[in-house]
């Protein structure tokens, strides 16, 4: 399903990006539009919420990021270690980001951050991409787009799928946050989703 890209970018530039879009943001948005236009699904609410999720999870950058927004794995690990030692990660029982016996770190990476080896393995099985052998692939745009789209369509992240929240007359912008992370920042992400949906001609 073709999207009027000029109308889309004109709309989001004003509503979500303060009147200006960097080239990297345009590239990230375009990569998600390209994936949607392959035709696997046609419900633009799905695309709007995927865009909203990528926007939120990357702090508006629309490029794959590491947990803590660090430039390198080593810096992300150091930041997480400091936060853990200071008691700022009460939800974490074991430091999953520390390198394993093979030197791999299972910290969060991507447009929607997957963490822990088991989750990399689950997404590897669904996408056919070797995320266990090379977890750093989640930092590549094409791979990260596939992880986000496949994960949100299949329910790989939490068991909840886009179809559980957008189907026929059902439109659940707030509850859709459960696809990724409970109801954390659910109202904020819902607002992004509605803005993207309007920009898509919804």
State where each predicted segment sits.
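Alpha-helical scaffolds flanking conserved acidic
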Residues: 43-52, 170-177
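Active-site-adjacent mobile loop/cap segments within catalytic or ligand-binding domains
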Residues: 172-194
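Short secondary-structure subsegments characteristic of cysteine-rich extracellular domains
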Residues: 196-201
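An N-terminal domain-cap segment
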Residues: 13-44
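Acidic interhelical loop/turn segments
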Residues: 160-171
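Secretory-pathway/luminal and periplasmic proteins that interact with or process carbohydrate-rich
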Residues: 56-67, 157-159, 185-190
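Peptidoglycan-targeting cell-wall enzymes and recognition modules
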Residues: 2-24, 50-152, 170
